[in-house]
């Protein structure tokens, strides 16, 4: 408990995201009484905090009662026409075709009527309080169906025989395999890698030379580290409705891919460029 007041004494002015606020305040008060925090140091911390708030004009906002804008004002700003237009422009200009197998794109129901859709996500690792219940992969699946594709969602077969599906059976059933990865990093999960399903990584992309295969990342732009041999790969950087609409326009050939990758999507691996 000495570490709490010691942190303030060492120059930390404020604690954020405490586990138990009342407990930490108790430690702070005890530290002040014990002399760990001097009156001068306490005054300095309070002055800095108040100065920061004043520089942001929070005292004026409090006096005017404008901390939270009226609903009418908020509705005139959130999702206003200008913001929607900017979002559409950003989506159209950012989606990146990292690499492609000649002849695979564009995707049309006439060319690939039967699509095996393989969603990858980490929602089972625990939902974030900042995300809604809509799955980005589900949004993409519905968009494919709306375009006229017959979409089958991949389900790993039960038992050991699941890893032994004949290649002939796959080629007879599907014209295209489309992977969609919605694997977002979080504050407590800064590295995200693909975890393949049982039995024995049954959803690993092993048909890339047999069935046209497209891999779409809706979040993390570094998935080629795990799927280097996928020959058509797209980074979207997000999976909201605006991005999915722009993606479908590009997949079907209604709009070109113009995005330039802001990072090295090949992760420094030569084999990912093949």
Regions found by a protein language model. Give the residues of each.
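Preference for extracellular/luminal or secreted protein segments
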Residues: 1-274
């Amino acid at each position: 408990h000495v570490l709490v007041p010691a942190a303030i004494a060492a120059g930390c002015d404020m604690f954020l995201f405490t586990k138990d606020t009342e407990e930490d305040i108790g430690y702070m008060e005890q530290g002040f009484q014990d002399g760990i925090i001097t009156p001068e140091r306490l005054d300095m911390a309070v002055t800095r905090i108040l100065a920061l708030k004043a520089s942001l004009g929070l005292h004026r906002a409090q006096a005017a009662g404008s901390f939270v804008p009226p609903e009418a004002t908020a509705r005139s700003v959130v999702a206003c026409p200008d913001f929607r237009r900017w979002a559409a422009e950003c989506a159209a200009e950012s989606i990146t075709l990292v690499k492609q197998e000649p002849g695979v794109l564009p995707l049309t129901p006439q060319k690939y009527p039967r699509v095996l859709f393989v969603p990858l996500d980490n929602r089972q690792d625990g939902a974030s309080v900042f995300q809604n219940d809509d799955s980005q992969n589900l949004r993409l699946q519905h968009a494919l169906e709306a375009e006229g594709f017959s979409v089958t969602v991949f389900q790993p077969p039960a038992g050991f025989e699941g890893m032994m599906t004949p290649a002939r059976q796959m080629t007879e059933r599907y014209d295209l395999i489309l992977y969609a990865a919605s694997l977002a990093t979080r504050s407590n999960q800064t590295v995200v890698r693909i975890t393949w399903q049982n039995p024995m990584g049954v959803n690993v992309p092993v048909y890339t030379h047999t069935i046209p295969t497209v891999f779409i990342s809706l979040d993390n732009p570094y998935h080629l580290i795990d799927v280097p041999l996928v020959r058509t790969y797209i980074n979207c950087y997000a999976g909201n409705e605006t991005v999915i609409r722009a993606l479908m326009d590009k997949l079907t050939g209604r709009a070109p891919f113009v995005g330039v990758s802001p990072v090295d999507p090949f992760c420094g691996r030569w084999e990912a460029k093949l």
